[in-house]
Regions:
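Short arginine-rich
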Residues: 33-35, 165-169
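Short conserved AdoMet
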Residues: 54-57, 149, 167
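Terminal amphipathic alpha-helical/low-complexity segments used for targeting or macromolecular assembly
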Residues: 1-59, 177-181, 185-240
Length: 240
């Protein structure tokens, strides 16, 4: 097996493999290019995301700065929004459902390292996938660790470190992150359902010209992405 095949199989692999290094360099360059794009150039940003990510839905907006390891392991559903300084270490798949909102300074880390220092010092590491359901709000400064699944209709409190799976329909917070409250049934939309109060693009996502004009939507309608996929909810995600 190649080191990349070992990586995708969840086995220990050498992160310094030439093929993997070249792919990370390519992704980092695209991230730097993305972060340098003028803030309100929505079309240019989305075109670059189509080059970087595996799949994305409609109304994708990621505030600069954004960094990832490979890009081709990341899938985003419709109405994805992240505030500044999102980091996704996608050595394995990272899948987001629809209507996912992420606060600033959040990280999703699939990468892990052996506890044995002799093995670790050889450059060996492993990766476990991360899955996030639909209708999820993640507060600022949250870390999501390797192998975690977050259900549908979940709120993760700011500053949390998510080390274990979080079930659907709860508020969870802490280090380690634990459910502290169940969301009322009437406050929980069906997975994939969009609230009437949720705009297609949140005000902070709108290009500056549209905001200055008081428009509810961007001045120019963004083109449909070349690659789209409806990610309905955690049950569908779990089939991956």
């Amino acid at each position: 097996m190649t080191e990349k095949e070992k990586q995708q199989a969840g086995e220990l692999y050498n992160g310094n493999d030439k093929e993997l290094v070249a792919e990370r360099v390519k992704a980092k360059k695209l991230c730097v290019e993305y972060n340098a794009i003028e803030y309100n150039d929505y079309q240019k940003k989305t075109r670059l995301l189509d080059r970087l990510l595996a799949l994305r839905g409609e109304n994708t907006w990621i505030e600069a700065n954004f960094f990832c390891d490979y890009g081709y392991n990341i899938i985003m559903g419709d109405n994805f929004y992240s505030n500044h300084n999102l980091v996704i270490l996608d050595c394995a798949e990272v899948i987001f459902g629809d209507n996912v909102f992420i606060g600033p300074n959040c990280g999703f880390y699939t990468a892990g390292h052996p506890l044995d220092y002799k093995t670790r010092n050889q450059g060996l590491e492993y990766a476990k996938p991360i899955k996030v359901g639909s209708n999820v709000w993640i507060g600022g400064n949250v870390c999501v660790m390797p192998g975690v699944t977050i259900g549908d209709n979940v709120v993760i409190g700011g500053g949390s470190v998510v080390t274990e799976d979080i079930p659907s329909g709860v508020v969870a917070v802490g280090n380690p992150c634990k459910p502290v409250k169940e969301l009322p049934k009437e406050d929980v939309p069906e997975a994939g359902e969009k609230s009437e109060d949720t705009p297609e693009i949140a005000p902070s996502q709108q290009p500056l010209k549209a905001q200055q004009a008081g428009a509810e939507k961007p001045a120019a309608a963004p083109p449909k992405p070349k690659k789209t996929r409806r990610v309905i909810g955690i049950e569908e995600i779990s089939k991956k």
